[in-house]
Amino acid sequence: MSDILDKIVATKKIEVAHNSSKISLGNHREQAEANNQSNLLKPRGFIQAIERKISAGKAGVITEVKKASPSKGILRENFISAEIAQSYEKHGAACLSVLTDSDYFQGCNAYLQEARAACQIPVLRKDFTIDPYQIYEARAIGADAILLIVACLELNQMMELEACAHELGLDVLVEVHNAPELEQALELKTPLLGINNRNLKTFEVSLQTTLSLLSSVPKNKTLVTESGILSRADVELMRKNQINAFLVGEAFMRAPDPGTALSELFA
């Protein structure tokens, strides 16, 4: 694990202990089960939404709702998650990815709830999931999918967390950065596989990360390239290599209107 991931995971363990002393796992489970019976809050089908776009010949874009990052600081001063969500939906996003980590990304659960309430597209809870408590919490706040980062987890942990997510109707995006992590990710059932082009040790970004791992990704997986997609040329490079799902954040967060930036990048 990288230094920054070590710090984040250590913080996350403290956060989970603190949160579970305030709201029990049982309470989150009850809310999650109630949400699953609610027309407004039942899962919207995160993977399906991406695959629908791809089947229609379009890019399946997961658009990020992110106020700040450890490497870049504040990305967007005028940050209203509901408005950002509506702008993305209007301009053709498949899904949203909402940062809920407070210590490193200045996110919160309310941003996810506000974004989801403002649109009809599915929402990924973008956080550092290390404990089943967070998965019940994710469904309780209305998330449609969760993220599992291989660099943060042992294989047996990932399998337990994935099973918990699927039991609640949540889709899972599993994220890797290198070949050993990819090998572990392929042990999971989820068809949704993200390759992060950002090295979490150095924060350097290279699109070659996705391209170099491409031949090892089975055809039955939906591959999402994450980070570093900043230009039309980047999009065209990926689509030329039959990569049609993208997770994009920073490029949109810095734009005056995130949705307009989305439609320009994926025109």
Swiss-Prot record:
PROSITE patterns per the UniProt record, alphabetical: IGPS
Catalysis performed (reactions): 1-(2-carboxyphenylamino)-1-deoxy-D-ribulose 5-phosphate + H(+) = (1S,2R)-1-C-(indol-3-yl)glycerol 3-phosphate + CO2 + H2O
GO annotation terms (biological process): L-tryptophan biosynthetic process
SUPFAM superfamilies in UniProt: Ribulose-phoshate binding barrel
Signal peptide: none
Pfam families: IGPS
Keywords in alphabetical order: Amino-acid biosynthesis, Aromatic amino acid biosynthesis, Decarboxylase, Lyase, Tryptophan biosynthesis
Assigned EC number: 4.1.1.48
Gene3D superfamilies per UniProt: Aldolase class I
Entries under InterPro entries matching the protein: Aldolase_TIM, Indole-3-glycerol_P_synth, Indole-3-glycerol_P_synth_dom, Indole-3-GlycerolPSynthase_CS, RibuloseP-bd_barrel
UniProt keyword annotation of Amino-acid biosynthesis present: yes
Pathway where this protein functions: Amino-acid biosynthesis; L-tryptophan biosynthesis; L-tryptophan from chorismate: step 4/5
EC top class, as a word: lyase
One MF term in the entry's GO annotations: phosphoribosylanthranilate isomerase activity
Superkingdom field: Bacteria
Family recorded in the similarity comment: Belongs to the TrpC family.
Protein name in the entry: Indole-3-glycerol phosphate synthase
Species for this entry: Polynucleobacter asymbioticus (strain DSM 18221 / CIP 109841 / QLW-P1DMWA-1) (Polynucleobacter necessarius subsp. asymbioticus)
